Amino acid sequence: MESFVAMKVVCITVLFVIVAVNESATSEANTSNAAKDTKKTNVTLQFPNYIPNPKQLALKLLEICKNNKSSLNSLTARSSTNYYAINDKYVDFKYYTFLCKHDKDRNVTLNMPPDTPCGPNGQKCANKSQCVGHIPGC
């Protein structure tokens, strides 16, 4: 009888291991699919209408974010992983800043380039007092 119980325990343990391995493989597949999705060209950016080329601005901000990460890595002993990201929800056209994510737990607020439009009448971030920002729903 004891061997029967021991055999049940072993079978249940093996079953849990199989399920855990399968779940891990599924999670890795979903992660790689999510990474592939970010490279698609049909991403809709939520920038104001006065931004003539949202994708170009996003790429410029991403480059600034990347360069900032590189300079921080040269000043510190932190790992030099290639992770950096921006989120169009955290681009502030009134205060000409954007949030740059360096690691999953490390963010920094950076300034947008001075030639970035920050208002519907051709205002640029170089003259910060004229920036109007983006009002949702307008």
Curated annotation (Swiss-Prot):
Compartment(s): Secreted
Gene induction: By feeding. By the presence of Borrelia burgdorferi.
Tissue specificity remark: Expressed in salivary glands.
SUBUNIT field: Interacts with host CD4. Interacts with host DC-SIGN (CD209). Interacts with Borrelia outer surface protein C (OspC).
Name of the protein described by the UniProt record: Salivary protein 15 Iper-3
InterPro entries: Salp15 (IPR021971)
Presence of keyword Transcription: no
Keyword Lipoprotein belongs to the record: no
Gene designation per UniProt: salp15
Residues with attached carbohydrate: 30, 42, 68, 107, 127
